[in-house]
Amino acid sequence: MNPMDRQTEGQEPQHQDRQPGIESKMNPLPLSEDEDYRGSGKLKGKVAIITGGDSGIGRAAAIAFAKEGADISILYLDEHSDAEETRKRIEKENVRCLLIPGDVGDENHCEQAVQQTVDHFGKLDILVNNAAEQHPQDSILNISTEQLEKTFRTNIFSMFHMTKKALPHLQEGCAIINTTSITAYEGDTALIDYSSTKGAIVSFTRSMAKSLADKGIRVNAVAPGPIWTPLIPATFPEEKVKQHGLDTPMGRPGQPVEHAGAYVLLASDESSYMTGQTIHVNGGRFIST
């Protein structure tokens, strides 16, 4: 189905009482794959880690990477059914997939996940730091210290940990891709802590790009706008879910599959002269960087 035909009048009101959300319970299901897309070997022989790769944007990137020939480790928290579905779709492309459940906010888990990947596949070429959580609050006064620390641990500490553990295995020509957000640039009154982590990711991306440029390792980011992923019904009330994405110039939420090409570009040699940059996929909102 063409993403442009989807959800121009919003979504069915819905809410999930857990984070992370479960993709298989969403209505309609997000579009994670372009069945007409044919890979051309851009990532053939490469090995990628994708955090939060079980669903949403991470799943879409994983499927596209698989179509381009990459073997993939999927890191996820505990959404086992979504992760198994992603694994099946990856393995349909005749590449290998390793599922690694656990909390990327935990440094020890990050170290173990990288080592498992290298032990299983023999190397590592691409790191996609994509996992995130958000907890809307009407005021900063309602953001507890526990929530603040948890959001930062998942969203930005995990990127430090994963990058540190991955770096000894990355060589010239390898790539790191970080998922930031439009909220890093526009802010969001209900997502003050989340937006702060996403702003930190932009600075982290730029700083790491400078740090690793002489080693030939590229570091870039993707900044999604309002996208139809499990995080939306898992965080917002039903009425806000219904209206999600309708205020964009394109008049609809984006689909995960509409981000896949950006991740493939940044993972492949086609972005050999790009580092420290952010690709904005947001339905037409103009961003001052």
From Swiss-Prot:
- Binding-site residues for substrate, renumbered to this chain: S181
Record key words, sorted: Oxidoreductase
Organism in which the protein naturally occurs: Bacillus subtilis (strain 168)
- Listed binding positions for NADP(+) are 49-73
Q: Name one GO molecular function term.
A: oxidoreductase activity, acting on CH-OH group of donors
Q: What class of enzyme is it?
A: oxidoreductase
Stated EC number for the protein is: 1.-.-.-
Q: What is this protein called?
A: Uncharacterized oxidoreductase YhdF
